[in-house]
């Protein structure tokens, strides 16, 4: 029956149903390190966060090799690094380099209406250049616009909500889970057709809430003596060649999604499609061209440094390794350690519970990589795109909304979240701690998500 959860994909060599919850300890460890060390051991963390990430990666990799066998363990680690981590870093790194070569010049002043325009524009652009591309393009001019303001933390929190996550819900280009769904057979325009109303409602409500909060903060800033500088600089975009290079990155993503050569290469037991190799080589070439063709003064105007992308690369190395057994347990479905959670998505009569699909996919996406989480629940819902796009369209909506929208709940829910925070910290913008951010996200986003659930899924 299509209403029965399908067999979930198992990576060759690892049976997720045989793994207990203790295998999740390294993943919990790296999450707690990211959350607590900056609070209680800031100096140690700043100097050693890369070593901490490697430590937790070893805490996962060594037991995998010792308990499951050396070849099984190394195959699993090599697979996640070559098939997932390296392409991920190449993609976000290329966007970071290219977007960092575009300097938007102008006398923008961080008034509430200007900030709302930035956030709204970013939410739209995220669907065409991805959440990472839109975030990296707009974060620097937004920081410049708000440079003179004292109370501005809320602007960058909502930037993560809207530009780095919710905004990218309309196309497969917007967010990795939707692109993965596209590769599995979901129509390119299906997401725009079915998620347009949820996107409009969620984005509209968040922009309205932000406007109210920022207006109150702006009045206090003015009362404390903030004066908007005279708007004298003419609007201009420096490093325009990078706009073309950014279009090239988008084109490479589309090529890898639409092309089906059937040609594969195998390296260290990992299979690579020709399209994926060409795509990643294009990313590297375009990033290299950006570094060669962009004037040094343009990057200096953006205060461009390598620190944010290096921080992401180091921490996500540990996250990607530690996540291996957790995802295998999730992929094991009803036979794995998360069986009690998985059982919630199916009602007693065999029908799908879309509310639980939404909240479970979303809650796990807030802490795990949202792309494989999307895939796991896509498979639990039957895995047939023809059925999920029609008869069970509401279920696919729930999975898509959960994986994209709830990436905003934590700093690690989506790559641009962490990159945005890293750039803000580097530029002297005070951001909340890991748990401090979650107070904002849970307090603001969850009521909006409950509204989305009631309107579209029940």
Role assignments for model-derived ranges:
Residues 191-293:
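Core mid-bundle transmembrane helix pairs that form the ion/substrate translocation pathway
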Residues 10, 42-43, 62-84, 96-110, ...:
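Transmembrane alpha-helix boundary signature
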Residues 12-23, 44-51, 74-86, 189-198, ...:
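Interfacial loop-to-helix junctions that mark the boundaries of transmembrane helices
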Residues 63-65, 126, 136-151, 155-157, ...:
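Membrane-interfacial helix-loop connectors
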Residues 2-9:
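Short, small-residue-biased leader/transition segments that mark boundaries at the very start
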Residues 22-34, 48-65, 85-95, 120, ...:
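Hydrophobic mid-bilayer segments of alpha-helices in multi-pass membrane transport proteins
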Residues 246-376:
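Transmembrane helical segments that form the transport core of multi-pass membrane transport proteins
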